[in-house]
Amino acid sequence: MELFKNKKLLLFILIVIVGVLPSCSGIKIPNVNRNIEEYTKSESMIFVSQLKNEYEETFGSDIWKLTSGDGKTKYESYVVSNVKKYLEVVKTLNLYFSTEIENSSKVITSSVNSQIMKVAREYIDSLSDGDKKYINCTLEDVLKMYTEYYKACYVIEYALRNEDNEISVSESKVIRVDQIVMSDKEKATKVREDLNQRGANFAYFARQYSESDVVSLKIERGDELSGMFPEAFLLDNGELSDVIEFNNKYYIFRCTDAYDQYETERRKEYIKKAIRSKAFTDFYSEYASQNVIVFKNPYWQEITLSNHPETKTTNFFEIFNKYFGEELKLQ
């Protein structure tokens, strides 16, 4: 199995986990509170700078003047808190790697170590003087974080090793149709009969009789519309449906594309990602509830994101993917 084939898979899954794991405040959960070695400030700042600069590239530096959804927390504090949670997840995955992966010591081979060193050197050589001042990291710090990140990636693929990644066309099919929507069944039946006439123009009938301003629809297998109108998936290109009743409305469809290949492939990847994300979130939630890692180092309260234009680096993951994104396999 290829490790980390989806180049942003780990980042995506960790964001999902950070977003969906419930707070344990006020809830008694049997667990083992792990006393582990926390990341140093310099090690953490590698990830802080990455996310800070990605936000500023997308939203501009004024983003830090805003507040989060509750209207009270500065967005700056909110993002720093999420980086902390993110790294707590990475540390939890590393704990799993060291305690649960059989022969884990053989995973990080001399070849892997050599590649990670290349990644670390390329990253630190890419940093500007401003980046170095803000992050204040050494080559050893970077090497440590890339090694931890590698192990976290490995655990994700290990957890998903038995997942079936094959999604059939029938599960992900996307079609396109034109529609006519009417409230009167008899009139709808008459329109359907008229559409059978040679040369009948569906667009003309839609303009004349449809009560909906929407004529063209995209219907994805598994979405709300596919549940309402499963008959639409039985149509061939150019074929008309019978009159379909739903919620006191009467629908006539004409299939314009019985298999939208591009959208179907996109849908397939979306479903695959959702299945893998759900499977890993379940795996992680069970393990993390029994092995709670919470960073307590006070430096997290001191980190600032605003007023640091000197740092621009955003290539931590890009460099990792350059070396490992398509190549590694589970041992």
Model region roles, listed by residue range:
Residues 191-229, 257, 261-263:
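Peptidyl-prolyl cis-trans isomerase
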Residues 42, 46-49, 81, 85, ...:
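Solvent-exposed, polar/charged alpha-helical surfaces in well-ordered, non-transmembrane soluble domains
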Residues 4-27:
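Sec-dependent N-terminal signal peptides of Gram-positive bacterial secreted proteins and lipoproteins
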Residues 55, 87-101, 120, 127, ...:
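Sec/Tat-exported extracytoplasmic proteins
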Residues 25-137:
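N-terminal targeting/tethering segments
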Residues 44, 49, 180-187, 211, ...:
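Solvent-exposed coil/turn segments that connect beta secondary-structure elements
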Residues 18, 26-29, 34-35, 131-183, ...:
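PPIase-associated folding chaperone regions across multiple families
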Residues 103-108, 202-206, 241-244:
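Surface-exposed patches in mature extracellular/periplasmic domains of secreted proteins
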